């Protein structure tokens, strides 16, 4: 999904045409290279002796090789049309002929997104795909993988919403008209793991809702639904006329898990408008200080930043200057400025100092930001409503007009 958001941002910024195409029974259109034999299906009344084995000629749904064979078949077709996979993401295909306008194709199994300013080339590629495979031209991109996509070409922006999917979830669990909540988690709510010797409910609405068996979290799960009820009209705005500039924020919450004393880390990246990449995770071990937790968060963000740089380079938007990664811990910044041995940090594995290494290479610039302005803070802890809403606005989430949602 990160590649999709980055592609949509770049396409909106350049005012590209965005179209989509869907393949019918995609796995049946692949080519099978292995020799596979089947037993005769039960109930088949053909004139075959008992114990006859059948040779499978084409991939079928349920065959382990089917997804790979379909991807190889599609990749061969796109290569014949002049496209090659991106080095950053093999599901993104780039036009190899640099004398022609840029043309990008994003593949997710049997759903394709086309992004280009070459309308003639777009029509040609779609017609060739329809000649070689069973597929349907869906026209301009309106929805993709559960996302509703609305364009404002005058402002060169794209708004992503999931109001239809949210309403389906709320209706499924009977929360369509529930009391809304401004935040997904209360700052006063402390969640703990279920004791191993306590019996759990194996069926009912809670396992169906969150996919696990911790009944004491039911109130928190219901609060998430009420939060979705209050934010179903929000959308993520991408694109814009401002230059594409990669900027990131990273943050950590030290030892915030009361049961394990482990820390939470999070990051977010934007290209000038809404966030295109984000992540929230829990450390795999106990960390000794808030500085150490911030170093872990910085390393995680630096890995994503380096990959985003590769992806943007393939899309023709290489960073013109080192991308800035904002953090709110001055001790972590001091350690990354000077490579020195410290008694309290010498045990930290070198791989977690990736942010320092990239800064020394000139591929990244670390900068300080106050905690109240660090957007990644929303991924590390529950916040009061005013702070939560402020960070959501900084992430690019804005209210969407009702007529756009209905369309």
Feature locations, PLM:
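Metal/cofactor- and membrane transport-associated sequence elements
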Residues: 1-106, 111-134
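Mobile genetic element proteins and their domesticated derivatives, centered on retroelements
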Residues: 7, 22, 38, 62, ...
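C-terminal reverse transcriptase regions that engage the nucleic-acid substrate
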Residues: 7-8, 138-235, 370, 378-380
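Structured nucleic-acid-interacting core domains from mobile-element enzymes and related host factors
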Residues: 11-15, 226-252, 317-319
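Short acidic, Gly/Ser-rich segments with clustered Asp/Glu that frequently serve as metal-coordination loops
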Residues: 23-31, 112, 252-260, 331-333
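Polymerase palm active-site segment centered on the conserved acidic dipeptide of motif C
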Residues: 81, 85-88, 113-166, 170-171, ...
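RNase H-like nuclease fold core
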Residues: 213, 248-291
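RNase H-like nuclease module associated with reverse transcription
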Residues: 245, 281-407
């Amino acid at each position: 999904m990160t590649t999709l958001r980055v592609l949509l941002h770049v396409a909106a910024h350049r005012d590209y045409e965005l179209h989509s195409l869907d393949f019918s029974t995609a796995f049946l259109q692949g080519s099978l290279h292995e020799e596979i034999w089947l037993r005769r299906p039960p109930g088949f009344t053909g004139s075959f002796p008992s114990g006859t084995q059948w040779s499978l000629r084409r991939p079928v749904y349920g065959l382990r090789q089917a997804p790979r064979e379909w991807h190889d078949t599609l990749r061969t077709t796109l290569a014949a049309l002049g496209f090659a996979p991106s080095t950053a993401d093999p599901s993104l295909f780039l036009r190899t002929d640099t004398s022609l306008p840029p043309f990008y194709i994003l593949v997710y199994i049997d759903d394709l997104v086309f992004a280009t300013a070459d309308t003639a080339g777009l029509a040609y590629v779609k017609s060739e795909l329809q000649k070689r495979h069973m597929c349907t031209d869906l026209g301009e991109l309106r929805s993709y993988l559960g996302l509703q996509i609305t364009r404002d070409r005058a402002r060169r922006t794209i708004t992503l919403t999931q109001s239809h999917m949210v309403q389906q979830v709320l209706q499924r669990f009977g929360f369509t008209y529930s009391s809304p909540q401004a935040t997904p988690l209360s700052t006063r709510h402390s969640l703990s793991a279920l004791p191993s010797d306590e019996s759990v409910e194996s069926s009912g609405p809670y396992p169906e809702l969150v996919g696990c068996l911790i009944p004491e979290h039911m109130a928190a799960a219901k609060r998430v639904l009420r939060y979705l009820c209050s934010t179903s009209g929000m959308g993520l705005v991408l694109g814009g006329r401002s230059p594409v500039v990669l900027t990131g924020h990273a943050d950590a919450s030290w030892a915030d898990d009361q049961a394990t004393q482990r820390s939470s880390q999070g990051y977010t990246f934007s290209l000038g408008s809404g966030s295109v990449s984000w992540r929230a995770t829990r450390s795999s071990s106990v960390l000794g200080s808030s500085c150490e937790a911030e170093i872990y968060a910085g390393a995680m963000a630096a890995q994503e930043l380096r990959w985003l740089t590769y992806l943007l380079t393939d899309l023709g938007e290489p960073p013109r200057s080192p991308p800035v990664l904002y953090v709110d811990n001055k001790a972590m910044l001091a350690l990354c400025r000077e490579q020195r041995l410290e008694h309290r940090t010498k045990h930290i594995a070198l791989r977690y100092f990736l942010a320092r290494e990239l800064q020394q290479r000139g591929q990244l610039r670390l900068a300080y930001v106050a905690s109240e302005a660090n957007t990644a803070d929303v991924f590390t802890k529950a916040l009061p409503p005013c702070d939560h809403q402020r960070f959501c606005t900084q992430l690019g989430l804005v209210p969407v007009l009702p007529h756009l949602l209905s369309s």
